[in-house]
Amino acid sequence: MSRKEAILEVARELFNEVGTQSSTTNHIAKAMGISPGNLHYHYKNREEIVRLLYINMRKETRLPIDELPKCITTLHEHEKLLIAVQWKYRFFFKEMLSLLTRDSELEDLYIKDNIAHRRRIRQVMNNLIINEELIITDEEDLDFIVDSISLSWQFYSSFLHTIGEELDATTVQNVIKYTSAAMKPYLKKREN
């Protein structure tokens, strides 16, 4: 692992532990055992570090269009991968709106990615319809399901925090229940 990669890893761990607001580049340098100047040789500021962590997270979750889930089983398998990555970068979901407000470059990148992600969720839903796992004939219903799934994935961590629930590696997995509930009324009935 290169020094640059090690700095990102230490920063991610620190952000997850105490949050980005409590983690200056000086804190990251201290946790790395390097001087602040050495850290700044690699990264201009904390926002650049957060932005690069976001880009790394995005790379870990993105599937090529032709590999998007085509059935409920593979969708659930993919959701488990997404949960693991979301837990790994949990600081981002907990502080998303604040992070986007502090860094317009990150905000622009996230909005662009979020629009693309919404299209990808819609493609997954279309795959499930084509493969007769879901029956959705109304475009408005399809948009509602796509948005419900997107909202669940993006804001579940924040939601837990606002109701006093502890977020841990187990509770974060409950987001799958919300995505499943959004699709449940449209599941094709299977004959026994």
Predicted segments with their positions:
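Short, Lys/Arg-enriched anionic-surface-contact patches
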Residues: 1-4
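Short, basic, alpha-helical segments at the C-terminal edge of helix-turn-helix-like DNA-binding modules
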Residues: 55-61
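Short, well-structured alpha-helical segments
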Residues: 76, 80, 139-150, 154
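C-terminal peripheral helix-coil segments that are non-catalytic and often amphipathic
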Residues: 123-126, 152-192
